[in-house]
């Protein structure tokens, strides 16, 4: 890793090295180019920046804490573990950071309708939330499989006034929901704003979502300086599409002393066909408007992803993550369903915090590493969301396990 500037991308064509770009239908290209112009103008507009700051502070509740996980640190017996508490945001996850930014852009562009895709439901809830706040109709595309395992979030979206469209094609998960949302966008391009929930899609979405989420890393930098007087030694975050991870990582990319680790969903193991680890088990290809690493078969067809976590159940990854993987600035590893569940239980019992199953993947990797590190090593884990939405999944898993009682005692 000889490069020192990792934060300059994307280029004018939306590329991070060979990844990213704009692979969209001809009817969408004018809108995508217009969105890029509007976003560049908004970034330079003091009024837009002021409005963003207002909603971050008074609506989302930022800054959220950087919390020393004392009992988890004692349990692991090594590195000093901090949690960046994104689950304390309004709506219970990092997703609202991006949704506020995009709805302000939609308003700026005169759009009258919002659409979004969702997997775990947290982006759907955040989109429905900002739609309600700004008085816009909202349609959420959600895979039928995900609707079954995320009933609480489906009800929350309906309470907030959103229309939920179940997607039964494919595996009925996030990939399929995104396909349907893109079809809607092509059909209703004039009045509709597509509020993409992760650092994927055609340019400018990967960079735009990253920028709206970078508040996570910026706050972490300031808070760690206040608490410890220096930068952290390592950062760990779960990666599906990768927006919470990119939000934490990006402000630190040019700080060579900071080790950065992204954690993919290993499912039943990367050596099986039931995982969602695009970087560790995929190859480059094009999906949903950008070139990135994807889970594909030998004919280039997208294969099914699997994870116990609905939010990581996606057969691709944001293009900037693909680039950071290739230039070796970020290390990407995978955690299995079982490892994530174990970490989920430990976090509940040791810290009194019920994390999302997505977050539990990052916690599992943090616990693995912390044990072998010095006690002056400062580690930050992005606590990307709370686990209320995952209660049924965890209950079902516990009920199916033969040794449930032994694990709980």
Swiss-Prot record:
Amino-acid biosynthesis is among the record's keywords: yes
GO MF, any single term: tryptophan synthase activity
Family matches, as SUPFAM superfamilies: Tryptophan synthase beta subunit-like PLP-dependent enzymes
Superkingdom of source: Bacteria
Phylogenetic classification of the source organism: Bacteria, Pseudomonadati, Pseudomonadota, Gammaproteobacteria, Pseudomonadales
Name of the protein: Tryptophan synthase beta chain
Protein keywords: Amino-acid biosynthesis, Aromatic amino acid biosynthesis, Lyase, Pyridoxal phosphate, Tryptophan biosynthesis
Protein family membership: Belongs to the TrpB family.
TM region positions: none
Keyword Amino-acid biosynthesis: yes
EC number of the protein: 4.2.1.20
GO cellular component: a single term: cytoplasm
Modified residues (N6-(pyridoxal phosphate)lysine): 95
Pfam name, any one: PALP
Requisite cofactors: pyridoxal 5'-phosphate
Cited CDD domains: Trp-synth_B (cd06446)
Reaction catalysed by this enzyme: (1S,2R)-1-C-(indol-3-yl)glycerol 3-phosphate + L-serine = D-glyceraldehyde 3-phosphate + L-tryptophan + H2O
UniProt xrefs under PANTHER family: TRYPTOPHAN SYNTHASE (PTHR48077:SF3), TRYPTOPHAN SYNTHASE-RELATED (PTHR48077)
Positions in coiled-coil regions: none
Organism encoding this protein: Pseudomonas syringae pv. tomato (strain ATCC BAA-871 / DC3000)
Enzyme class: lyase
Quaternary data: Tetramer of two alpha and two beta chains.
Pathway in which the depicted protein is active: Amino-acid biosynthesis; L-tryptophan biosynthesis; L-tryptophan from chorismate: step 5/5
């Amino acid at each position: 890793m000889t490069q020192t500037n990792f934060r300059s991308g994307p280029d004018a064509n939306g590329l991070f090295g060979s990844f990213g770009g704009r692979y969209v239908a001809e009817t969408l290209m004018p809108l995508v180019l217009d969105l890029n112009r509007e976003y560049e103008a908004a970034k330079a507009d003091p009024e837009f920046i002021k409005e963003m700051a207002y909603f971050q502070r008074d609506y989302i509740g930022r800054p959220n804490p950087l919390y020393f996980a004392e009992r988890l640190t004692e349990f692991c017996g090594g590195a000093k573990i901090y949690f960046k508490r994104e689950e304390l945001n309004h709506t219970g996850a990092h997703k609202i950071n991006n949704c506020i930014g995009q709805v302000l852009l939609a308003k700026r562009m005169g759009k009258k309708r919002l659409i979004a895709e969702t997997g775990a439901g947290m982006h759907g809830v955040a989109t429905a939330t900002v739609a309600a706040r700004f008085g816009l109709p909202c349609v959420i595309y959600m895979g039928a499989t995900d609707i079954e395992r995320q009933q609480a979030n489906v009800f929350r979206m309906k309470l907030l006034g959103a229309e939920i469209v179940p997607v039964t094609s494919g595996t009925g998960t996030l990939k399929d929901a995104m396909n349907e949302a893109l079809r809607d966008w092509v059909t209703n391009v004039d009045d509709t704003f597509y509020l993409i929930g992760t650092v994927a899609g055609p340019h400018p979405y990967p960079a735009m979502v990253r920028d709206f989420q970078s508040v996570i890393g910026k706050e972490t930098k300031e808070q760690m300086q206040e608490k410890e007087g220096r930068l952290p030694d390592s950062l760990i975050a779960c990666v599906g599409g990768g927006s919470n991870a990119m939000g934490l990582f990006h402000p630190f990319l040019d700080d060579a002393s900071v080790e950065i680790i992204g954690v993919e969903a290993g499912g039943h193991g990367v050596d099986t066909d039931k995982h969602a680890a695009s970087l560790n088990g995929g190859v480059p290809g094009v999906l949903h408007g950008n070139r990135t690493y994807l889970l594909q078969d030998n004919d280039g067809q997208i294969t099914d992803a699997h994870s116990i976590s609905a939010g990581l159940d996606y057969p691709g990854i944001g293009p900037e993550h693909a680039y950071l993987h290739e230039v070796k600035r970020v290390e990407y590893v995978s955690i299995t369903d079982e490892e994530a569940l174990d970490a989920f239980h430990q976090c509940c019992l040791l810290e009194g915090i019920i994390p999302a199953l997505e977050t539990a993947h990052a916690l599992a990797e943090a616990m693995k590493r912390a044990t072998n590190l010095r006690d002056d090593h400062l580690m930050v884990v992005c606590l990307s969301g709370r686990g209320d939405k995952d209660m049924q999944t965890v209950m079902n898993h516990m009920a199916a396990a033969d040794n449930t009682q032994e694990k709980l005692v």
